[in-house]
Each structure stands twice: as structure tokens, then as C-alpha cells.
């Protein structure tokens, strides 16, 4: 059986670097980022330098692709123009290129920051309204909406993964609730690329965490079975947390320090707000 060809943008980043060895045996990977190719390409990998803000560079990138894992874009908070260029305009550019190439599947790396202003005391699923905690979070909420549009309008099959924190182990108390081992993310991405019944699925990128703030039933219904748990790393996470100290705003909300940055709102009102369901 011929392996599918999957484009991975943002392949030079931390998440892409962790995913590559976990997906390379299953797919032919076309890796892409703005810089030159790394020195460790595998036989099933090739590199295409491209920029999300340059549409002309994206058509040859997507040519012949069966699927797209879109990790590219600006990955931290910044001013609006800095975030919007790659994360909003760039996302539309790569989605349009995927559509033009006949690419059937898209995995969009959304983020927990699309819902970061929910209190830590509230367990949420994927049917609550978005509550972004930053311009970065706004761009991820936009990305989910754009994937929904492409699924409905052009019959592309999309999965938006609200990634918590991808690492070999969680690094603080907050991450005990949102952490996902790279093995589990690779499993979830594979489901998004291969499950026959996906239209546009929104799921959480999290492992089997006892302290989870999220109901990940949408992922479980698709067959996701995480093999890792943050509880196996509690001692390390809490030791690291002790070095950080308290954050008066961030410790109340799921988005943490993203919520606290430049905060001038009403904490009580935000904690008690009940947004209408979308």
C-alpha cells in the first residue's frame, strides 16, 4: 500500500521536531519552514522552504499532498500585526493552497489559548464558546472557524487540535492539567488524517491527565486512547512550580500567564461569566 504524502508546516519548531520520528514511518513527510533543511532528514522525509505569508511558495509545497499538518505560524503572544500575518493571513494562504492542490485532510494546530479565559474550576468540552486569552488565542479561534468553513464549503476533512503542552513531561502545576505526550499527539494526528467520518472535529491535545480541565469526549469518540498520564510526573512538575511562585491572575484561569499579561479587566466578572453556547 502506497504511503500517503503529508505536508508538515512549522517542522523546525519544537512540536514538529518531536512529531517527525513518530510519523516518518507511517507517511511520506514533506517538511516545511522558513529556514533551510535540517541535517537529519530521514529517507521518508524531504524539505521545502516556504513562507506562509508568500502564497507563491505554497503551491509547490502542497502539490501532490494527501494531507496537511499545519503547525506553522507565530507560536507566542505578540502585537496584533506580528500574530496576524502568519496566523490569520498565512493560514488562509495555506488552506487555499491545500484546496487548490486537492488535499483532502487538514490537521490544524489550535491551542488551549483559544479558550484560555475559562476558570480553572470549570471543566469544559468543545461545545462552549471560545474565550481567547491573547491575540495568539484569537488567531487560533479564527483558525478553527476557517477549518469549519473549508469543511462545509469545500468538503475538506479537518481536525482542530487545541494543544495543551507538548513535551516529554509536564513542567509545572498548570501543565499537569493540559500536558500531552508526543506519542499521544501523534496518535491523535493519525486519527485526524485517517478516520473516515471526520468533517470538522475540534478536540483537545491532552494525555490521560487526572487533573484535566477538559472533557475530551470528542477525541475519545473517534478512537483516541492516550497512553500517558501527567500524574506520572507530579513530583517533577511541582518542584518546578515551586520555582515560579504565584500569579494573582494567571493562577485563576486556564490560560495562565497569557491571561495575566497586560490584564486590566475585572477578575470576578470574568470568573463568573457564562457565555452563550455558539
What are these regions (language model features)?
Residues 163-169, 179-201, 208:
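Alpha-helical substrate-binding/gating segment
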Residues 85, 119-155:
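Catalytic helix-loop patch of NAD(P)-dependent Rossmann-fold dehydrogenases
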Residues 45, 49-86:
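NAD(P)H-binding glycine-rich loop region in Rossmannoid oxidoreductase-like domains
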Residues 27-38:
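Conserved glycine-rich Rossmann-like NAD(P)H-binding loop of the short-chain dehydrogenase/reductase
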Residues 93-131:
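Conserved Rossmann-fold NAD(P)-dependent oxidoreductase catalytic core, especially the SDR/UDP-sugar
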Residues 208-225, 240-268, 272-273:
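Conserved C-terminal active-site "lid" loop/helix of NAD(P)H-dependent oxidoreductases
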Residues 53, 82-93, 101, 112, ...:
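Glycine-rich NAD(P)-binding loop of the Rossmann-fold in SDR/ketoreductase-type enzymes
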Residues 4-25:
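N-terminal Rossmann NAD(P)H-binding glycine-rich loop of SDR-like oxidoreductase domains
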Amino acid at each position: 500500500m502506497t504511503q500517503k504524502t503529508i505536508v508538515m508546516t512549522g517542522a523546525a519548531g519544537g512540536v514538529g521536531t518531536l512529531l517527525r520520528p513518530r510519523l516518518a514511518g507511517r507517511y511520506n513527510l514533506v517538511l516545511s519552514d522558513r529556514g533551510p533543511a535540517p541535517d537529519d532528514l530521514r529517507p521518508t522525509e524531504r524539505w521545502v522552504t516556504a513562507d506562509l505569508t508568500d502564497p507563491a511558495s505554497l503551491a509547490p509545497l502542497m502539490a501532490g499532498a494527501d494531507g496537511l499538518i499545519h503547525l506553522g505560524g507565530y507560536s507566542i503572544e505578540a502585537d496584533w500585526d506580528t500574530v496576524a500575518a502568519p496566523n490569520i493571513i498565512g493560514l488562509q494562504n495555506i488552506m487555499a493552497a491545500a484546496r487548490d492542490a486537492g488535499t483532502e485532510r487538514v490537521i490544524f494546530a489550535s491551542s488551549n489559548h483559544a479558550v484560555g479565559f475559562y476558570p480553572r474550576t470549570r471543566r469544559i468540552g468543545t461545545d462552549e464558546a471560545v474565550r481567547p486569552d491573547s491575540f495568539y488565542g484569537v488567531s487560533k479561534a479564527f483558525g478553527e472557524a476557517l477549518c469549519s468553513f473549508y469543511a462545509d464549503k469545500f468538503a475538506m476533512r479537518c481536525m482542530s487540535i487545541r494543544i495543551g503542552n507538548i513535551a516529554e513531561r509536564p513542567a509545572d502545576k498548570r501543565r499537569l492539567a493540559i500536558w500531552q505526550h508526543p506519542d499521544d499527539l501523534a496518535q491523535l494526528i493519525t486519527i485526524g488524517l485517517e478516520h473516515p467520518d471526520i468533517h470538522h472535529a475540534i478536540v483537545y491535545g491532552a494525555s490521560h491527565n487526572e487533573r484535566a480541565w477538559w472533557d475530551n469526549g470528542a477525541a475519545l469518540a473517534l478512537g483516541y486512547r492516550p497512553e500517558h498520564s501527567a500524574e506520572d510526573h507530579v513530583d517533577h512538575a511541582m518542584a518546578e512550580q515551586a520555582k515560579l511562585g504565584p500569579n494573582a491572575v494567571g493562577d485563576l484561569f486556564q490560560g495562565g500567564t497569557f491571561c495575566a499579561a497586560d490584564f486590566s479587566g475585572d477578575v470576578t466578572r470574568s470568573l463568573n461569566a457564562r457565555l452563550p453556547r455558539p
